[in-house]
Amino acid sequence: MIEFDNLTYLHGKPQGTGLLKANPEDFVVVEDLGFEPDGEGEHILVRILKNGCNTRFVADALAKFLKIHAREVSFAGQKDKHAVTEQWLCARVPGKEMPELSAFQLEGCQVLEYARHKRKLRLGALKGNAFTLVLREVSNRDDVEQRLIDICVKGVPNYFGAQRFGIGGSNLQGALRWAQTNTPVRDRNKRSFWLSAARSALFNQIVAERLKKADVNQVVDGDALQLAGRGSWFVATTEELAELQRRVNDKELMITAALPGSGEWGTQREALAFEQAAVAAETELQALLVREKVEAARRAMLLYPQQLSWNWWDDVTVEIRFWLPAGSFATSVVRELINTTGDYAHIAE
């Protein structure tokens, strides 16, 4: 299995180095749910600004403040502790008057707004995230500048970030140990983390191998394509390749790679043979996903950061802004820019 740091680059290995997250203010994330609170209902959506607090810790503190069980507070995604983040929490408080949430106090946290909502906020129920990153001590400004220009046109590999695999790859190692035994894993969080790490590693491997062929954006017979921003896909046939290639070039369609699991992967013929060969050595992880009935799915191989802009504060410091859809990783953008001395594994998804 290819380690995250050794995955194939789309724009070649960066020539320069830089520092990611010298302080929390260098990594700002603003969650975009894609909808507004309903204004009524048994749930309360709370938008919180936090610095130095992880999401679960804040959710538990909010539950204590509201005198409800911790399981009654949900969120769409984990946000990094060592960053400045805005995100929504959702508390189920039925049949009660609206609590005065402006009185909620927690060091490093501030309630920005809150309103009633009809539905529980579930994990993954967000449109995306807006990022403002500051890279410091950049050793090669010209290289980073050109890479930013290239990323605007060609995007970056849509890799799952190193944080998906845990500190030191602990989640992937757990999955491998589990795959080698039939011992049940009772802890639901461990099950989720380990299965997610296994499937993500296989996806990354397929994309890395496709990049080695230099045809990551070239449609081949049997590729599974999806409309940009959509989840469903269809299979490319030889007769359609020219027209489909035009639509891929126009970023109307995205070529996908497998998220292996039980059931058919989605590709056929040449594309399927390539994907199977790319992960042929990882029989244990594939068997684990099938055994645990994790359904196969698809994910776009390339990621195009939206609203990408940047500003050089000086020759060694650059502020970069962009928006990514849910499930994408800012660190997969950064790794195409610099060889960073920051720690990816400590950046929450």
Curated annotation (Swiss-Prot):
GO biological process, one term: tRNA pseudouridine synthesis
Known EC number: 5.4.99.27
A single Gene Ontology CC term: cytosol
Keywords attached to this entry: Isomerase, tRNA processing
Keyword Membrane: no
Family annotation (CDD domains): PseudoU_synth_EcTruD
GO molecular function: RNA binding; tRNA pseudouridine(13) synthase activity
Protein name: tRNA pseudouridine synthase D
Source organism of this protein record: Escherichia coli (strain 55989 / EAEC)
Gene: truD
